[in-house]
């Protein structure tokens, strides 16, 4: 295994940095020793170096499982600019491009291959990875919090990743598996470890505290008041880059149109846009052609604009983990940034929008769980996903719910076995618990950063003293 001096020489040669930041060196040592790890590192903490450096120094191919195309392309382009052997594989590639990457994979010409969980588990890619000539060095799961997310953004393939090593066979089954995320509390960390079947992982965690982010929550009495607060906020931040987060596609479209009618250069970004439209809009915002984007949580991962001066939550996220991810888009240049969340008054009598939104997402989650229970009575107790998908709609989602609840075991990424009555968890109750945490944050009179850090089990000095910059601290409540 390489010593720290040779690792720092490689760091200097490839990236131009003289020294590692904690815990980069420790994570790299762990991976080079072929041990599993879980890394919770705030946005901008340099997590990509943790898996890119050992991949480039070691022998064989490192797979990087990533949720979004923009995230993959950004990192691969950066590596290619330095003539490093990296590629990404996703559904938006042309047929010749895809063929070229598969050829490079088969010929062992790559050190890093970025791909989504769905692409990884597709038949041509999986069969190629199982070939004896393809030597694997490790599997890195980026944005690992996706494993514990539910709702519209949930992707069932994540629940099958824990069976990767078992499916790859005896020789390749000994490779290390690492999970990286910017946000995960203790419960979510445990879920990630269990869901991925990490083997006695080393855990590295850095405080999520971002002192340059000034957190504020403002109560509104009606939809009209909410829009007027938004308008006043934007007038205060003219010529500054920022993001307006909403929870639904319809709201993104309607709110962007309302802003355009009032002269603001804002556009809507959501999951319904095609790949070309998404890239075009991302570039317009990154290059300053527009100052703000009204977006759902489809926007953000892999988009790095250091001078983002504000984030406004027109509708609050339902989970504290999502909130921390989204405000983390601001202030990456370490300069002060304002993060404002607009919320309905607590009773919901005058403006029931927030309450209805929570009820809607809980209702959707409940429907998924009910569907899973019905399907579990209809499908064979043991079976192959590919053979059964055509006969059972929503099979993948149902199997993911059953796996999360402890009723199902993946024998490999394609074959399952149901364990009836073997309940380990109630996903719906866990979701309600996460919603309550978010509500506590929005209604607290304590320091907002302290509230977040306590919720995430952070023991740093920042968790023991008021931040001095949030709205509660500024009015003397802390």
Curated annotation (Swiss-Prot):
The Helicase ATP-binding domain sits at: 28-202
Q: Give the EC number(s) listed in the UniProt record.
A: 5.6.2.4
Q: Which residues bind ATP?
A: 41-48
- Which BP terms does GO give this entry? DNA recombination; DNA repair
Mind telling me which SUPFAM superfamilies this protein's record contains?
P-loop containing nucleoside triphosphate hydrolases (SSF52540)
List UniProt keywords, sorted A-Z.
ATP-binding, DNA damage, DNA recombination, DNA repair, DNA-binding, Helicase, Hydrolase, Isomerase, Metal-binding, Nucleotide-binding, Zinc
Q: Which cofactor does it need?
A: Mg(2+); Zn(2+)
Q: What does this protein do?
A: An ATP-dependent DNA helicase which unwinds DNA in a 3'-5' direction.
The record's family statement is: Belongs to the helicase family. RecQ subfamily.
The record's misc note reads: Cyanobacteria do not encode always the HRDC found in most bacterial RecQ proteins.
The protein in question is named: ATP-dependent DNA helicase RecQ
Organism listed in the record: Synechocystis sp. (strain ATCC 27184 / PCC 6803 / Kazusa)
């Amino acid at each position: 295994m390489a010593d720290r001096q040779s690792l720092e020489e490689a760091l200097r040669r490839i990236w131009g940095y003289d020294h590692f930041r904690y815990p980069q060196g420790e994570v790299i040592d762990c991976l080079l020793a072929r041990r599993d790890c879980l890394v919770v590192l705030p946005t901008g903490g340099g997590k990509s170096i943790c898996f890119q450096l050992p991949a480039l120094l070691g022998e064989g191919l490192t797979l990087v499982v990533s949720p979004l195309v923009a995230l993959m392309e950004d990192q691969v382009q950066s590596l290619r600019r330095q003539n490093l052997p990296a590629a990404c594989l996703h559904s938006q590639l042309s047929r010749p491009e895809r063929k070229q990457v598969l050829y490079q994979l088969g010929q062992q010409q790559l050190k890093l291959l970025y791909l989504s969980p769905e692409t990884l588990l597709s038949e041509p890619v999986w069969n190629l990875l199982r070939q004896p000539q393809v030597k694997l060095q490790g599997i890195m799961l980026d944005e690992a919090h996706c494993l514990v997310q539910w709702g519209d953004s949930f992707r069932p393939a994540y629940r099958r990743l824990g069976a990767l090593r078992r499916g790859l066979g005896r020789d390749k089954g000994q490779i290390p598996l690492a999970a990286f995320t910017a946000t995960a509390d203790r419960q979510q960390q445990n879920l990630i470890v269990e869901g991925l079947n990490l083997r006695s992982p080393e855990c590295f965690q850095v405080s999520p505290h971002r002192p340059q982010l000034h957190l504020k929550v403002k109560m509104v009495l009606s939809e009209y008041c909410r829009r007027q607060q938004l308008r006043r906020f934007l007038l205060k931040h003219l010529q500054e880059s920022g993001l307006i987060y909403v929870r639904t596609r319809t709201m993104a479209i309607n709110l962007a149109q309302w802003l355009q009618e009032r002269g603001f250069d804002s556009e809507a970004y959501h999951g319904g846009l095609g790949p070309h439209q998404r890239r075009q809009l991302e570039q317009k915002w990154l290059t300053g052609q527009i100052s703000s984007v009204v977006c759902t949580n489809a926007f953000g991962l892999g988009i790095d604009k250091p001078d983002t001066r504000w984030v406004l939550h027109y509708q609050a996220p339902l989970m504290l983990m999502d909130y921390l991810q989204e405000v983390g888009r601001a202030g990456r240049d370490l300069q002060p940034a304002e993060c404002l969340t607009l919320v309905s008054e607590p009773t919901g009598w005058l403006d029931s929008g927030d309450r209805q939104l929570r009820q809607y997402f809980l209702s959707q989650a409940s429907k998924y769980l009910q569907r899973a229970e019905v399907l579990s009575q209809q499908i064979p107790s043991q079976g192959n996903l590919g053979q059964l998908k055509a006969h059972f709609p929503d099979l993948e989602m149902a199997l993911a719910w059953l796996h999360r609840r402890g009723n199902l075991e993946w024998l490999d990424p394609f074959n399952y076995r149901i364990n009836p009555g073997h309940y380990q968890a109630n996903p719906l109750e866990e979701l309600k618990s996460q919603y309550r945490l978010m509500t506590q944050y929005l209604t607290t009179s304590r320091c907002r950063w302290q509230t977040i850090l306590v919720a995430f089990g952070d023991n740093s000095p920042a968790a023991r003293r008021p931040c001095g910059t949030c709205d509660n601290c500024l009015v003397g409540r802390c």
